[in-house]
Amino acid sequence: MLNELFNECETKMKSSVNHMLRDFKTLRTGKVTTSVLDNVKIDYYGTLTALDQVGSILVADATTIIINPWEKNLLNIIDSAISKANIGATPNNDGSQIKLFFPAMTVEQRQESVKQMKGMGEHAKVAVRNDRKNANDKIKKSEKDKEITADESKSAQDNIQKITDKYISEIDSILKTKEAEILKV
């Protein structure tokens, strides 16, 4: 029973870290990535479709993304969808491809990105701590219902704390690495 609880708790904590990493993809760092286009969709024959489903997307350099649609009639549709998405880039449609030029990030923008990232990290830590609380509540209930002894309860709570410390430490490590990446000019 306790092993199942430990595994469940660890799975939930790992999920919180993965959710934070997915959220980080929306942050702008010093280098542009194709993930800035993940939420841009176009009307493709009546269906909302992601850009990577209608053409190739590649990063040309630290501030430029090139979109080559497989159907040239989509150029204007893609251009307008990007403009409406307000992703901070200027689309340049040359008739065969679209180039997105992102301005270099200012120090203030970098600091704002770090601030957002730390908020996401704190949110993940709160989720991990909530998972710990839920697991400890289940352990205490099992002890109260006489399913486990007081010693087993204490040992199980210590184990849950070790798992929590592992994931909090992992979040801190990821935050430190990401902060250095964002602030690097």
Curated annotation (Swiss-Prot):
GO molecular function, one term: ribosomal large subunit binding
PANTHER family tied to this protein: MITOCHONDRIAL RIBOSOME RECYCLING FACTOR PSEUDO 1, RIBOSOME RECYCLING FACTOR
Family annotation (InterPro entries): Ribosome_recyc_fac, Ribosome_recyc_fac_dom, RRF_sf
Pfam families membership: RRF (PF01765)
SUPFAM superfamilies associated with the record: Ribosome recycling factor, RRF
UniProt keyword list: Cytoplasm, Protein biosynthesis
CDD domains, A to Z: RRF (cd00520)
Record NCBIfam families: frr (TIGR00496)
Biased amino acid composition, Basic and acidic residues: 131-155
Primary subcellular site in the record, as a coarse category: cytoplasm
A GO biological-process term: cytoplasmic translational termination
Function: Responsible for the release of ribosomes from messenger RNA at the termination of protein biosynthesis. May increase the efficiency of translation by recycling ribosomes from one round of translation to another.
Region (Disordered): 131-156
A Gene Ontology cellular-component term: cytosol
Localization terms from the record: Cytoplasm
Protein name from the UniProt record: Ribosome-recycling factor
Family: Belongs to the RRF family.
